Amino acid sequence: MTTPTIELKPSAHPLSDSERAAILANPGFGRHFTDHMVTIKWTEGRGWHDGQLVPYAPLSLDPATMVLHYAQEIFEGLKAYRRPDGSVATFRPEKNGARFQASSRRLGMPELPVDTFIEACDALVAQDEKWVPAHGGEESLYLRPFMIATEVGLGVRPANEYLFIVIASPAGAYFPGGVKPVSIWVSEDRVRAVPGGMGDAKTGGNYAASLLAQAEAAAKGCDQVCYLDAIERKWVEELGGMNLYFVYGNKIVTPSLTGSILEGVTRDSLLTVARDLGYEAEEGRVSVDQWQRDSENGTLTEVFACGTAAVITPVGTVKRAGAQWQQSGGETGEVTQRLRDALLDIQRGTVADPHGWMHTLA
């Protein structure tokens, strides 16, 4: 199968150096976007074609475009980092590309070759390289590849036309004032996904389904919501957009992939990093009752969440119906901080990359 080369059609009017510098001084997250985007089309019978890097601009969609009605949409999230020598590298883009393919299969969409996924990301980062923040802090350039069904029509079936796009947004430090534990509401009424559903696909529908539960968590005074399994309503699965880890002294456990949990790239990486640091890291099942009991008796020493945006987020206060408890006295635990520092050091290029995770742009 042939894949398109990315044709470069750069903007004649990119943002000025001073305008870009003002944004990079306080980028936030997802509020500003670089000068360009990459687009690739897919048409039934023709496959992937017309790969282009073009100026960032709005999309024009017919009101009957199928994605607007039947939600054939998937996305990814990864970061580009400035290295100490001034070069730029992305973190494990092949893992994101493979997960993008898995999401495509689940939603009946065409699979973009992983090499093309990486080529598209590389092309955008290379063109907008000045948008990658300076080395030294936790700032990065966040990449958002996504794909939508663009065929026009109201028939309920897989579309025969799609558009793949990559956009980029400078991202500030997730914890600009230092790492702070988050509070969690354990929802025993709402579920994120069911066996045989789309829980292991990165698709917008899963996030839309989480918004009500997130609002309920906020009403309980919590930052995040934790979901349990859909069958027994007892096994811990994940947060709305992050995986969870439980620390039992030298043993670290993350919920096993069940088909209803998203296979996070950070989650996978931390299993390896933890073992490199001498911890016993494994996948297993943790019930919410066990979580509460082991926290209260002191055997569960720390809990943290992980994902691309924040890397690692310590868990402080946990609430469920009729109960409340704290992890690590509401502070960031020693193991949590050690793992966070170790992974960030690899991503920022301040230590060796023993597993070849960083993809440096030529």
From Swiss-Prot:
Species name: Streptomyces coelicolor (strain ATCC BAA-471 / A3(2) / M145)
Cross-referenced SUPFAM superfamilies: D-aminoacid aminotransferase-like PLP-dependent enzymes
Recorded family membership: Belongs to the class-IV pyridoxal-phosphate-dependent aminotransferase family.
Alphabetized GO MF terms: L-isoleucine-2-oxoglutarate transaminase activity; L-leucine-2-oxoglutarate transaminase activity; L-valine-2-oxoglutarate transaminase activity
Entry EC number(s): 2.6.1.42
Keyword entries, A-Z: Amino-acid biosynthesis, Aminotransferase, Branched-chain amino acid biosynthesis, Pyridoxal phosphate, Transferase
Catalytic activity: L-leucine + 2-oxoglutarate = 4-methyl-2-oxopentanoate + L-glutamate; L-isoleucine + 2-oxoglutarate = (S)-3-methyl-2-oxopentanoate + L-glutamate; L-valine + 2-oxoglutarate = 3-methyl-2-oxobutanoate + L-glutamate
Modified residues (N6-(pyridoxal phosphate)lysine): K202
Job of this protein: Acts on leucine, isoleucine and valine.
PANTHER family in the record: BRANCHED-CHAIN-AMINO-ACID AMINOTRANSFERASE (PTHR11825:SF44), SUBGROUP IIII AMINOTRANSFERASE (PTHR11825)
Lineage: Bacteria, Bacillati, Actinomycetota, Actinomycetes, Kitasatosporales
Gene3D superfamilies cross-referenced by the UniProt entry: 3.30.470.10, D-amino Acid Aminotransferase, subunit A, domain 2 (3.20.10.10)
Pfam families: Aminotran_4
GO BP of this protein: isoleucine biosynthetic process; L-leucine biosynthetic process; L-valine biosynthetic process
Protein's name in the database: Probable branched-chain-amino-acid aminotransferase
Metabolic or biological pathway: Amino-acid biosynthesis; L-isoleucine biosynthesis; L-isoleucine from 2-oxobutanoate: step 4/4; Amino-acid biosynthesis; L-leucine biosynthesis; L-leucine from 3-methyl-2-oxobutanoate: step 4/4; Amino-acid biosynthesis; L-valine biosynthesis; L-valine from pyruvate: step 4/4
Enzyme class: transferase
Cofactor (UniProt): pyridoxal 5'-phosphate
CDD domains in alphabetical order: BCAT_beta_family (cd01557)
